[in-house]
From Swiss-Prot:
One of its GO terms (molecular function) is histidine ammonia-lyase activity. It is found in: Cytoplasm. One of its GO terms (cellular component) is cytoplasm. There is a cross-link at residues 146-148 (5-imidazolinone (Ala-Gly)). InterPro entries: Aromatic_Lyase, Fumarase/histidase_N, HutH, L-Aspartase-like, Phe/His_NH3-lyase_AS. Its EC number is 4.3.1.3. It is an enzyme of class 4 (lyase). Belongs to the PAL/histidase family. The gene is hutH. The modification 2,3-didehydroalanine (Ser) is found at residue 147. This is Histidine ammonia-lyase.
Length: 515
């Protein structure tokens, strides 16, 4: 097995490639050497405030509504430990390992920028856990996205203290046991360190990044499936003419139309009906793909830009400015930008699925597609894709409800001290469910379109789409007669979610990537 190359963490400068590496697989991470001075100066500033005894929020005071209560110096370590124990009140299923790895990475990156007042050992412990494959068990529910992701990040911090549970290679065990096996000492929190660890938007951002990377795969797979559907239905490629899109000027639409042209170029199926086709215009689900999918691309990229900024951000409170010896209370923990970005991704994911469902409906309707009813030989004896489409319709409808913006809601907490919140954590968390729904829809479309291509033989589709067809048929055989279909749909869903369908046409999809 090849050892993965080490990722050098440059706080404030992480790229999508960096984040995607950690999201995809365990990756060894080391901290850039130029962070040390800022970290040490920030920690020294906090210790100086403690030594002077002057009140500073989160350093020697209570928290939230209890901020006016000053804590004696000899109680400060106890204060930080109490903070973690009292705030670890999350519920629900644990975050998946890939999301939890992003949380650890982004928390280390934020603290290492030197505005949080923590010692180097705190950052080193986070990275040591990441490198040892120790994934804290972080419940996915319990955060309102301000003041930071308090409850889930408290569960992350529990593992650093040797409390709570963690997973190693998928096996859940006591965190203290996992740390000991890796030779990592549990930490004792100094002044402000507990607050710095739990104040921040890293959980919301990790969930939203998970949705972002899945949305990128969905967009690419649905574009391939949509192009296959055009050929399967003997649709026209004229709507993808660059002149149509240039006069509108929408960047995503222009890029997406070019992708469709590349995917369909050279199709013998298309050449077979260039002359004598009495259809003047295709239905919108075929003809308007660049307009819809291009808008989704623009939305995904806009959300991505926000999330990349947030992944590199300092979202702690209060912030420590070592150069001035000051501590300033602010509100960078408020995850409204993340909530908005996640809501935008939800719209894109829902719309990708909605358009795909409409193309399935077109393909199974012989009056629209010219293909056998429900895409099966001997219709009547066989039901073919009839109920597979019903499943797609059910999931498309479900996504429409899940796409309701989470950010429009707010409930005051902490005795009205925290009186407006973002709901960013739920905004990000529901994206995985929505992506799974859309992947199933697009997978069903891919099967339906491949079936349509098969019916046109000996006419062949384009070289690019032939590779997609081969990819589909490598997992799911031609549907000659009714059979148990659920395993085939699951296999197609995995082709979409794992990125294999998009990868089959990778050379044509560069303009649909985030970076």
């Amino acid at each position: 097995m090849t050892t993965p190359s080490i990722l050098t963490l440059h706080p404030g400068e992480m790229t999508f490639a960096d984040l995607r590496r950690v999201w995809l697989a365990p990756t060894p991470v080391t901290l850039s050497g130029d962070c040390a001075a800022a970290i040490e100066a920030s920690a020294a500033t906090v210790q100086a405030i403690v030594a002077r005894g002057e009140p500073a929020y989160g350093i020697n005071t209570g928290f939230g509504k209890l901020a006016r209560t000053q804590i004696a110096t000899h109680e400060l370590e106890h204060l930080q430990r109490n903070l973690i124990l009292s705030h670890a009140v999350g519920t629900g299923q644990d975050l998946d390992d890939n999301v939890a790895r992003l949380v650890l990475l982004m928390k280390a990156a934020s603290l290492a920028r030197g505005y949080s007042g923590v010692r180097r050992v705190v950052i080193d412990t986070l990275l040591a856990m990441l490198n040892a494959g120790i994934v804290p068990c972080i419940p996915s529910k319990g955060s309102v996205g301000a003041s930071g992701d308090l409850a889930p990040l408290a569960h992350m911090t529990l593992a650093m203290l040797g409390e709570g549970d963690a997973r190693v290679n998928g096996v859940r065990k006591p965190a203290r046991e996992a740390l000991a096996a890796a030779g990592i000492a549990p930490i004792a929190l100094a002044a402000k360190e507990g607050l710095a660890l739990i104040n921040g938007t890293q959980v919301s951002t990790a969930l939203a990044l998970n949705g972002l990377f899945l949305a990128e795969r969905l967009l690419q797979a649905a574009t391939v499936a949509g192009a296959l559907s055009v050929d399967a239905a003997k649709g026209s490629d004229a709507p993808f003419d660059p002149r149509v899109h240039t006069v509108r000027g929408q960047a995503g639409q222009i890029a997406t139309a070019a992708v469709y042209r590349g995917l369909l170029a050279g199709s013998a199926i298309r050449r077979s009906h260039l002359v004598g086709d009495t259809r003047v215009q295709d239905p919108y689900s075929l003809r308007c793909q660049p307009q819809v999918m291009g808008a989704c691309l623009d939305l995904i990229r806009q959300a991505g830009a926000t999330l990349l900024t947030e992944a590199n951000a300092v979202t702690d409170n209060p912030l420590v400015y070592a150069d001035a010896g000051e501590v300033i209370s602010g509100g960078n923990f408020h995850a409204e930008p993340v909530a908005f970005a996640a809501d935008m991704l939800a719209l894109a994911i829902a719309e990708i699925g909605a358009l795909s469902e409409r193309r399935i409906a077109l393909l199974i309707d012989s009056t629209l597609s010219g293909l056998p009813p429900f895409l099966v030989e001997q219709p009547g004896l066989n039901s073919g894709f009839m109920i597979a489409h019903v499943t797609a319709a059910a999931l498309a409808s479900e996504n429409k409800s899940l796409a309701h913006p989470a950010s429009v809601d707010s409930l005051p907490t902490s005795a009205n001290q925290e009186d407006h919140v973002s709901m960013a954590t739920f905004a990000g968390r529901r994206l995985a469910e929505m992506a799974g729904n859309t992947a199933t829809i697009v997978g069903i479309e891919a099967l339906a379109a491949a079936q349509g291509i098969d019916f046109h033989r000996p006419l062949a589709t384009s070289d690019a789409l032939a590779r997609a067809h081969t990819c589909i048929r490598s997992r799911v055989a031609y549907y000659g007669e009714d059979r148990l279909f659920a395993p085939d749909i699951e296999a197609a869903r995995r082709l979409v979610l794992d990125g294999d369908l998009g990868d089959s046409c990778r050379a044509h999809l560069a303009d649909l990537a985030l970076a």
